[in-house]
Amino acid sequence: VENLTYEMFYHLVTEFPHTNTNPSQNRPAQQFELAVRYLENNYTYNCTIEDLCVSLSLSRSYIYNLFQKFAHTSPQKLLTQMRMEDAKSKLTSSNQSIQEIADLVGYHDTFTFSKAFKRYSGYSPSTYRKHFS
């Protein structure tokens, strides 16, 4: 299940860099694209924003500025959104335990996952599964 916000990020990543022909002005857009791709490829692991910064050799403040400029959100919020949308999908389409789903979306502590999921969706994972399966 993809929501409208995730689709917006996908659109930004796939379309925005092609709208500017000046390579020096494209650099931040390309860095943003790389950052989003990194999160898409690694959100299922216990990756952090620090891991993203190290991977791209960029400072934390620069990464946050990129996300504010191109996505009007923080990288942490996008990372959480990716994890929670995947968790919502898994909760409604599989019989995997909440612990297994937490592990699959990058949380290795079920309590932390459950708190984050409730904050994101308004439901505990088990309640969400019951209501939306």
What residue spans do the PLM features occupy?
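Feature detects amphipathic, helix-rich regulatory segments
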Residues: 123, 127-129
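Terminal helix-turn-helix DNA-binding modules in bacterial transcription factors
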Residues: 36-37, 41, 46, 50, ...
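Short, highly charged
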Residues: 64
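Short, Lys/Arg-enriched, Trp-marked, Pro/Gly-tolerant hinge/linker segments that flank
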Residues: 1-2, 6-41, 45, 50-56, ...
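Core residues of bacterial helix-turn-helix
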Residues: 55-56, 105-106, 117
